[in-house]
Amino acid sequence: MTRASELKKSDVIEVNGTLYAIRQIEVQSPSARGAATLYRVKASAVGGGPKFEERFKGDDDVATVALQRRAVQFSYVDGDDYIFMDNEDFSQYLLKQDDIRDELAFITEETQGVLALKVEESVIGLELPASVVLDVTETTPAMKAASSSARTKPATLNTGLVVQVPEYIVAGEKVRVNTAERKFMSRA
């Protein structure tokens, strides 16, 4: 059993005998004194099926299921299916585009450190590394009179993700992006 305040995205919980993979958690802090913080959990059934949405108080106990993490490498796309290969035994895992839509903004064929999350031999999602290196494909030109203030501009990366970067970054450069915050960290 895990407290609701300790749940995180991609955890698997068991509710009424059904396994659900957490897709989103919203924290709601009430303004009244003594009121408990609420955690709104949105999840989808493992292996397909109904969606699940529930609110928990921070000290509520929730039944969680142990996940197995396997290092994988992105292999190829087949329609709406994304195929990843296990780095150890070379088995292939198929994930639907809708299940990994948020993670796709950070994954290229060169991305290292991606983990497949498995429950009872079925892959339910991906866990990304803390940061990834991506190529800048499009951005406005650098300004000659760049001031000492930290001004930023939008840059489109090779996965389609748009992040704010410092003015001195130009198209063709590699940048390191924080996957949790979706923000520029540094040049790579």
Swiss-Prot record:
It holds the Pfam family EFP. Gene3D superfamilies: 2.30.30.30, Nucleic acid-binding proteins (2.40.50.140). GO terms for cellular component: cytoplasm. One of its GO terms (biological process) is peptide biosynthetic process. GO terms for molecular function: translation elongation factor activity. Belongs to the elongation factor P family. NCBIfam families: PRK00529.1, PRK04542.1. This is Elongation factor P-like protein. It comes from Alcanivorax borkumensis (strain ATCC 700651 / DSM 11573 / NCIMB 13689 / SK2).
